[in-house]
Amino acid sequence: MISVAYAADAAHAAAHGAFYTEPHFWVDVAFILVVALAFKPVSRAIAAALDARSAKIKSRLDEAHKLREEAQEMLATYQRKQRDAMKEAEEIIAHAKAEAERLAKQAAKDLEVSMKRREQMAMDRIAQAEAQAVREVQNLAVDVAIGAAQKVIGESLSAAQTGSLVDNAIKDLPGKLH
């Protein structure tokens, strides 16, 4: 079979001439030359495009990495600020509680002092009222005694006796006033 195919190709070659006279041959040669000549610049262009794309991707990755680091730093900063704010808030609350306790104790002391002062004022008023009541009772007793004495003296003493009693009372008055 090979011999039959070879013979057919040989007959075909003899009828058409040598292989380099065939247009298919020259198309194939031209294609191979174009591909061979274009391969180096095209491969360089493709390599350059791939390198540029690779550099661009690397740049974006570096930028993304940098942004991620910045975001982590910002997160850490905000977390630190939040912790500081929470600590400060706790300190403020503790201070406010201590201040409230101090104010409550002070208010209790002030209330106690005020109550004692009011109690003392009430006791003073009671003592004044008592003293005034005693004076009024004494004055009333003196008035009653004077009235009774006048009545008794007026009924039992004569005018001469009354005059001598008044004179004696006036003489004794400076000694009794001191």
Curated annotation (Swiss-Prot):
Database matches in Pfam families: ATP-synt_B (PF00430)
GO MF annotation: an example: proton-transporting ATPase activity, rotational mechanism
Keyword Cell membrane: yes
Residue ranges crossing the lipid bilayer per the database entry: 29-50
Keywords, sorted A to Z: ATP synthesis, Cell inner membrane, Cell membrane, CF(0), Hydrogen ion transport, Ion transport, Membrane, Transmembrane, Transmembrane helix, Transport
Cellular component terms per the entry's GO annotation: plasma membrane; proton-transporting ATP synthase complex
InterPro entries referenced in this protein's UniProt entry, alphabetically: ATP_synth_b/b'su_bac/chlpt (IPR002146), ATP_synthase_B_chain (IPR050059)
Quaternary organization: F-type ATPases have 2 components, F(1) - the catalytic core - and F(0) - the membrane proton channel. F(1) has five subunits: alpha(3), beta(3), gamma(1), delta(1), epsilon(1). F(0) has three main subunits: a(1), b(2) and c(10-14). The alpha and beta chains form an alternating ring which encloses part of the gamma chain. F(1) is attached to F(0) by a central stalk formed by the gamma and epsilon chains, while a peripheral stalk is formed by the delta and b chains.
General function of this protein: F(1)F(0) ATP synthase produces ATP from ADP in the presence of a proton or sodium gradient. F-type ATPases consist of two structural domains, F(1) containing the extramembraneous catalytic core and F(0) containing the membrane proton channel, linked together by a central stalk and a peripheral stalk. During catalysis, ATP synthesis in the catalytic domain of F(1) is coupled via a rotary mechanism of the central stalk subunits to proton translocation. Component of the F(0) channel, it forms part of the peripheral stalk, linking F(1) to F(0).
The family this protein is said to belong to: Belongs to the ATPase B chain family.
Protein name, UniProt field: ATP synthase subunit b
Gene behind this protein: atpF
